[in-house]
Amino acid sequence: SPRFHSSNLKGPVPMGLSNWNGYIPQVIKLHPLEGDTRYGRAMEAIRQFYVPDAAGGARTSPHKAALPVYVMFVTDGSTSDKSATEKQLRWSSMEPIFWQFMGVGKGRKSKNKLLAAFQDSDFPFLESLDELPGRLIDHANYFAVHSPAEHSDAALYELLMPEYHGC
């Protein structure tokens, strides 16, 4: 499966049972965090990998696949390619791809009650994607957490799955 890190579309090797211990510090060491994130570029690459016939571009009719794709999209910032991101989300609504956006920081849809009380958000664009018009189906969800570590595995799983129905 493809892996993406910041604007690097190759990204780190997948995490598994054999390399989970110390995985995150090693990834950050090999792939330092950057100041630019292009959601649209990453979404296009994911679509090209899973549904190559569309070449990451527009689709005019629904596409079927043997298995749906669940994309967990984790970010701590906004994107520099908002228009491309919106196009990718609209086009991919014809494909069996579900996008779960998780903002790490402060958001209006924060699952931390203390943060939810704030009116401002680090993720207004992600919040708008969750309700983006012009899609065949609602195939995206968004939430924010101050830190994923503040939630148990079971609670985090519940946050990740409420709108996913297997496309």
Q: In which residue ranges do the predicted regions lie?
A:
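MIDAS-like acidic motif and immediate structural context at the N-terminus
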Residues: 74-76
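Aromatic/pi-system hotspot detector in well-structured domains
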Residues: 1-2, 51, 90-94
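Von Willebrand factor
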Residues: 1-16, 18-68, 71-72, 79-81, 102, 105-115, 119-121
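Conserved beta-strand elements of beta-rich interaction domains across eukaryotes
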Residues: 2, 78-79, 106-107, 147-150
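Residue-level recognition of the N-termini of beta-strands and the immediately preceding loop/turn
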Residues: 67-70, 97-98, 138-141
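C-terminal helix of von Willebrand factor
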Residues: 131-167
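VWA/integrin I-like adhesion module and closely mimicked acidic/polar interface patches used
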Residues: 78-132
